[in-house]
């Protein structure tokens, strides 16, 4: 017994009970967040966007999901400790670290460091919960990691020698470790409606980062009101926040953190596709080969 998966409730619907689709969608929404985060660098403060990213969805969920929150309130009161922990780690720390890191490092480096997530999840689960890893899982991680490196190296191994890392990369690596901790602790999430969980998760995250956002504002670091920043706020409030975390949480609930980890490798795949479609970046043969390896490993 690894304790990796929590007990799964009765079926609710095809999408809700399809972990692979849910995890692929979570990676899709997070890849869009990377593009938006890079596009608005310098336009919005990192802590400010982290706070708004959870504050606005929490307010909206508080209005639309009130019956679920009311019904789940006894569970929330009983399990407030783990809910507080998940909100601080997975919401406040991970989100803020992501935007801070994007201020100082390149998309290429982020793609390299993202490939650490599946390994970090396995290592963290082994250390904290003594999880066991199957040979198939290790093989899948290895194959998808090679696919990521093929894309990053543009098909030439020598290109990896020219990668340069900075202290922003240290932030990203630390952030990947934070996400791994969040992923393995999801098994402790109490049984409650997904809207109730996201409401509490978002409220904890927003309240944790709010004082730092106020400090940013006092220091004169504020949002620059443009159509780009408005679009960015709308996007990050809906897709990489509510929808991505709801999909990821459910996927981990269904198949466990270790098997979910390799889906993070889809993020650079999606990012490359978005770059080709939206930014007219050229798709090469090495992209296709790398994509095939990523899909095979996942």
Where in this protein do the model-derived segments appear?
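Hydrophobic transmembrane alpha-helices of multi-pass small-molecule transport proteins
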Residues: 61, 84, 124, 133-155, ...
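Specific transmembrane alpha-helical segments of multi-pass solute transporters/efflux pumps
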Residues: 29, 33-34, 62-114, 150, ...
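Transmembrane alpha-helices of multi-pass small-molecule transport proteins
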Residues: 2, 42-93, 120-121, 177-182, ...
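Glycine-/small-residue-enriched transmembrane alpha-helix faces in small-molecule transporters
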Residues: 2-51, 88, 161-188, 208
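Hydrophobic/aromatic residues within transmembrane alpha-helices
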Residues: 40, 49, 53, 101, ...
């Amino acid at each position: 017994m690894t304790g990796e998966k929590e007990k799964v409730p009765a079926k609710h619907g095809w999408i809700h009970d399809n972990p692979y689709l849910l995890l692929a969608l979570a990676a899709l929404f997070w890849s869009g967040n990377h593009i938006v985060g890079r596009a608005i660098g310098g336009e919005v403060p990192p802590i400010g966007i982290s706070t708004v990213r959870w504050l606005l969805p929490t307010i909206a969920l508080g209005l639309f999901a009130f019956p679920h929150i009311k019904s789940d309130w006894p569970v929330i009161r009983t399990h407030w400790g783990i809910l507080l922990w998940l909100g601080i780690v997975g919401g406040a720390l991970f989100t803020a670290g992501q935007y801070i890191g994007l201020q100082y490092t390149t998309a290429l480096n982020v793609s390299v460091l993202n490939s650490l997530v599946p390994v970090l999840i396995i290592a963290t689960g082994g250390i904290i919960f003594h999880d066991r890893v199957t040979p198939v899982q290790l093989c899948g991680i290895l194959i998808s990691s090679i696919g990521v490196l093929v894309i990053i190296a543009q098909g030439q191994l020598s290109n990896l020698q020219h990668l340069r890392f900075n202290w922003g990369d240290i932030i990203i690596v630390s952030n990947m470790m934070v996400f791994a901790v969040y992923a393995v602790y999801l098994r402790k999430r109490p049984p409650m409606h997904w809207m109730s969980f996201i409401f509490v998760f978002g409220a904890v995250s927003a309240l944790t980062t709010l004082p730092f956002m106020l400090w940013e504002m006092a220091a004169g670091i504020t949002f620059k009101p443009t159509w780009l920043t408005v679009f960015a706020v709308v996007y990050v409030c809906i897709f990489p926040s509510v929808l991505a975390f709801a999909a990821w949480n459910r996927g981990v609930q269904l198949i466990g953190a270790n098997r979910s980890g390799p889906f993070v490798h889809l993020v650079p795949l999606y990012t490359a596709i978005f770059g080709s479609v939206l930014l007219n970046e050229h798709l090469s043969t090495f992209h296709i080969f790398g994509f095939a390896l990523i899909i095979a490993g996942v």
